[in-house]
C-alpha cells in the first residue's frame, strides 16, 4: 500500500517535471501571440498583485521548510517545498500573461528561488549523509554565476549570459532531488539526483562563463 506522503510528493514531483518541460513552450507560444491581442482590458489590481503574492508566498515557505527539516517533520517539509516550487511555475508566467511585470517581481523571483534552494540544502546537510559535497558545489556555482550576471549587467551586457538547456536540466534535477530528500522517499535516489544536479551545475556554469568571454575581453581592451 502506497503511503499518502509518498503519493503527495510523487504527484508534486511529476508536476515539477511537467513544469520544466511545458512551461518553456507556453512561454514561447505566449511571446508569439502577445502582440496579436492589441485590444485587451487593463489588468485589474488583483492581477497586478497575484504574481508578487506568489513570490512572497515562496519566500514565506523558506523558514517553514528549514524548520520542518530541523524538527524532523519530513511530511511538512516535502509538502511545503513542493508547494513553493510549484508557485515558481506560475508567478513569472502570470506576470507575462497579464502584462504586469514589475521591477520588484523581477528582483524577488530569483531571490526567492535561491533562498529556497540554499536554505533547503543547508538543512539537509545537517541531517542527511552525503549531501554536503554536492550542496557546496551547487551553492558555489550559484554565487559565481550571480557575480557573473552582476558583472555583465554593470557593463550593459545583461543578456550576454542566457540560461541554456544544461541550466534548465540542472534546475529540474535539483528540484526533484530536493523534493525526494526532504520527504525522505528514496534517500539513495535523491542523493544520486543531487550529485547529477551538482555536475550539471558546474557544467552549465562553465558554459555561462564561456558565453561571457567577449564581455571580459571588451573590459580588458577598454582604455583606462
Regions found by a protein language model. Give the residues of each.
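Short, hydrophobic transmembrane alpha-helix segments
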Residues: 65-73
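Short hydrophobic/aromatic, small-residue-rich stretches within specific transmembrane helices
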Residues: 78-85
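A feature for the membrane-embedded catalytic helix bundles of lipid/isoprenoid biosynthetic enzymes
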Residues: 21, 25-29, 33, 39-49, ...
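N-terminal chloroplast transit peptides
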Residues: 2-28
Amino acid at each position: 500500500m502506497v503511503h499518502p506522503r509518498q503519493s503527495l510528493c510523487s504527484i508534486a514531483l511529476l508536476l515539477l517535471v511537467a513544469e520544466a518541460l511545458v512551461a518553456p513552450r507556453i512561454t514561447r507560444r505566449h511571446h508569439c501571440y502577445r502582440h496579436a491581442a492589441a485590444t485587451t482590458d487593463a489588468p485589474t489590481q488583483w492581477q497586478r498583485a497575484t504574481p508578487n503574492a506568489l513570490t512572497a508566498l515562496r519566500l514565506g515557505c523558506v523558514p517553514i521548510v528549514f524548520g520542518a527539516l530541523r524538527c524532523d517533520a519530513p511530511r511538512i517539509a516535502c509538502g511545503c517545498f513542493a508547494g513553493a516550487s510549484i508557485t515558481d511555475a506560475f508567478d513569472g508566467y502570470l506576470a507575462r500573461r497579464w502584462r504586469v511585470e514589475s521591477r520588484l517581481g523581477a528582483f524577488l523571483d530569483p531571490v526567492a528561488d535561491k533562498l529556497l534552494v540554499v536554505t533547503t540544502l543547508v538543512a539537509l546537510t545537517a541531517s542527511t549523509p552525503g549531501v554536503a559535497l554536492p550542496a557546496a558545489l551547487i551553492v558555489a556555482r550559484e554565487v559565481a554565476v550571480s557575480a557573473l550576471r552582476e558583472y555583465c549587467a554593470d557593463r550593459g551586457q545583461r543578456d550576454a549570459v542566457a540560461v541554456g538547456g544544461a541550466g534548465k536540466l540542472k534546475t529540474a534535477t535539483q528540484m526533484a532531488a530536493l523534493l525526494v530528500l526532504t520527504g525522505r522517499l528514496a534517500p539513495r535516489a535523491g542523493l544520486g539526483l543531487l550529485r547529477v544536479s551538482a555536475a550539471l551545475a558546474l557544467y552549465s556554469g562553465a558554459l555561462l562563463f564561456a558565453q561571457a568571454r567577449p564581455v571580459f575581453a571588451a573590459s580588458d581592451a577598454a582604455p583606462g
